């Protein structure tokens, strides 16, 4: 190893602490709570843990048919959790009937979802996913009720509902 290569490698090592300190800032910029540790689990590993239809939505970013989810009519008090890793994503008090055919919410639990640009349909949409397992949940639109004006439109198969009187499931790895 010559001196130049040695110095280059040492400069990379010296930068590692700074990069690791920036990771929480990157998560926060994506709207993710830095206290939620993303799972380092390949999507394929979830195949045996969730139903095939849920897998297609969560990890292949498919969309269920509008009006097909039993969660559309869910009005009881409770929490909607990710169907893959069980991270709480929405509180029932933020659910409303949007007329879209999908369970809709005015806001997620702060820091429990991340967003990204989605160009699958020619125009730009904002896709959101579970901050922990990365499972696709749905899209957020700017046509919701006041005061936020947001409609978090979720695939019902990407969620599970837990009644307020029941204990939340332990997070699944």
Question: What is each residue range found by the language model?
Answer:
Residues 1-17:
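N-terminal secretory signal peptides and thylakoid transit peptides that target proteins
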Residues 21-57, 65, 173:
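C-terminal segment of N-terminal export signals and the immediately downstream linker at the start
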Residues 58-75:
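N-terminal post-signal-peptidase region of extra-cytosolic proteins
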Residues 75-104:
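Mid-length scaffold segments of soluble, non-membrane domains
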Residues 79, 127, 150:
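Residues immediately within or flanking Cys/His clusters that coordinate Zn2+
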Residues 82, 130-133:
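Short cysteine-rich clusters marking metal-coordination/redox-active sites
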Residues 86, 134, 157:
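Cys/His-coordinated zinc-binding microdomains
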Residues 91-92, 139-140, 162:
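Short, non-ligating residues that shape and space the ligands of small metal-coordination modules
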């Amino acid at each position: 190893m010559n001196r130049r290569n040695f110095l280059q490698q040492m400069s990379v090592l010296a930068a590692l602490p700074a990069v690791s300190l920036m990771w929480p800032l990157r998560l926060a910029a994506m709207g993710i709570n830095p206290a939620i540790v993303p799972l380092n689990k390949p999507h394929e590993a979830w195949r045996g843990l969730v139903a095939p239809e849920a897998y297609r939505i969560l990890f292949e970013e498919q969309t269920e048919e509008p009006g097909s989810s039993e969660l559309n009519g869910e009005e009881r008090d409770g929490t909607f959790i990710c169907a893959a890793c069980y991270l709480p994503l929405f509180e029932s008090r933020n659910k409303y009937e949007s007329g879209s055919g999908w369970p809709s919410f005015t806001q997620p639990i702060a820091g429990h979802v991340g967003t990204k640009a989605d160009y699958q349909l020619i125009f730009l949409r904002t896709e959101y996913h579970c901050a922990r397992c990365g499972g696709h949940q749905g899209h957020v639109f700017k046509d919701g009720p006041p005061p936020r004006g947001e409609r978090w439109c979720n695939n019902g198969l990407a969620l599970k509902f837990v009644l307020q009187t029941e204990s939340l499931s332990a997070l699944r790895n």
